[in-house]
C-alpha cells in the first residue's frame, strides 16, 4: 500500500529530556482518499541491546534496575529485569553495546553478533533498537558493573533454563530480554557446551 504523507503541523512540546512533538498530518491513500491525523511522537533516539550468554556454563547475564515508567503503569516496585542496553547517542550500535556491557555488567565482550533492528513501540515512539548477542566468560569480567552515576544496576548471572522459566512466570517482562532469550532458545546456540573454557 502506497501512502502520500503531508505534514500540516509539527510542534515541539518538550525538549526537557528527549523530544516530544505534536504532529498533524494528512495521508493520501492509494484510492485518493485523504485522512487527517493528529498524534504525539516521542523521539528518544535509537538504542542497542545485548544478551550475554555462556554455553559452557549454560548461563546468561541480565540486569535489574528501577524503571519509573513501569512503576507508573502498575509494576509495584518499579524494578525490571532486562538485557544490557543503552542509547546510541553518537556511537555506532556495536560500540554502544560494548560500552554498555562494561558499564552495566562489568564484562568486556569479544565477538558480538547482530541479529536485527526493531521498532519497539511504533505507535508513538521513534526509537529503533539494534539487537545483539555475545558470548562471555568469567575471564572477561573486568569490573563489578552496576552502571554509572546513580543507575544502581544489579547484575544477574542466571542459569539459562531459569531465565526462560522467569519469562514464562512473568518475572521477566522486558521486551528486549524476552526477544533475545527466546532467540537464544530457538537458535540452538545453548543446546550444547562450548569448547571454550572460562
Swiss-Prot record:
Top-level taxon of origin: Bacteria
Residues reported in the UniProt entry to bind GDP-alpha-D-mannose: 38-40, 67, 85-87, 104, 127, 150-151, 176
UniProt catalytic activity: GDP-alpha-D-mannose + H2O = alpha-D-mannose 1-phosphate + GMP + 2 H(+)
Residue intervals of the Nudix hydrolase domain: 43-180
CC cofactor: Mg(2+)
List of residues binding Mg(2+) 1: 85, 104
GO biological process: nucleoside phosphate metabolic process; ribose phosphate metabolic process
Pfam families according to UniProt: NUDIX
One Gene Ontology cellular component annotation held by this UniProt entry: cytosol
Enzyme Commission (EC) number: 3.6.1.-
GO MF: hydrolase activity, acting on acid anhydrides, in phosphorus-containing anhydrides; metal ion binding
Broadest EC class assigned to this enzyme: hydrolase
Keywords: Hydrolase, Magnesium, Metal-binding
Binding, Mg(2+) 2: 100, 104, 151
Annotated motif Nudix box, positions: 86-106
Covalent S-S links between cysteines: none
Complex and partners: Homodimer.
Recorded family membership: Belongs to the Nudix hydrolase family. NudK subfamily.
Entry text on domains: In the dimer, the N-terminal domains are swapped between the two monomers, such that residues of both chains contribute to the active site.
Function statement: Nucleoside diphosphate sugar hydrolase that hydrolyzes GDP-mannose as its preferred substrate, yielding GMP and mannose-1-phosphate.
Protein name as it appears in the record: GDP-mannose pyrophosphatase
Amino acid at each position: 500500500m502506497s501512502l502520500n504523507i503531508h505534514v500540516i503541523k509539527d510542534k515541539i512540546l518538550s525538549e526537557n529530556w528527549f523530544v516530544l512533538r505534536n504532529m498533524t498530518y494528512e495521508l493520501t491513500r492509494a484510492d485518493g482518499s485523504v485522512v487527517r491525523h493528529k498524534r504525539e511522537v516521542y523521539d528518544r533516539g535509537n538504542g542497542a541491546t545485548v544478551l550475554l550468554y555462556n554455553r559452557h556454563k549454560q548461563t546468561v547475564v541480565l540486569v535489574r534496575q528501577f524503571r519509573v515508567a513501569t512503576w507508573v503503569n502498575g509494576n509495584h516496585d518499579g524494578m525490571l529485569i532486562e538485557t544490557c542496553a543503552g542509547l546510541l547517542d553518537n556511537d555506532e550500535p556495536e560500540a554502544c553495546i560494548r560500552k554498555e556491557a562494561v558499564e552495566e555488567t562489568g564484562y568486556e565482550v569479544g565477538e558480538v553478533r547482530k541479529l536485527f533492528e526493531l521498532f519497539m513501540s511504533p505507535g508513538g515512539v521513534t526509537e529503533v533498537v539494534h539487537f545483539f548477542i555475545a558470548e562471555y566468560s568469567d575471564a572477561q569480567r573486568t569490573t563489578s558493573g552496576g552502571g554509572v552515576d546513580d543507575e544502581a544496576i544489579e547484575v544477574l548471572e542466571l542459569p539459562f533454563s531459569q531465565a526462560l522459566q522467569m519469562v514464562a512466570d512473568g518475572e521477566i517482562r522486558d521486551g528486549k530480554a524476552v526477544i533475545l532469550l527466546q532467540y537464544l532458545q530457538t537458535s540452538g546456540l545453548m543446546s550444547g557446551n562450548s569448547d571454550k573454557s572460562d
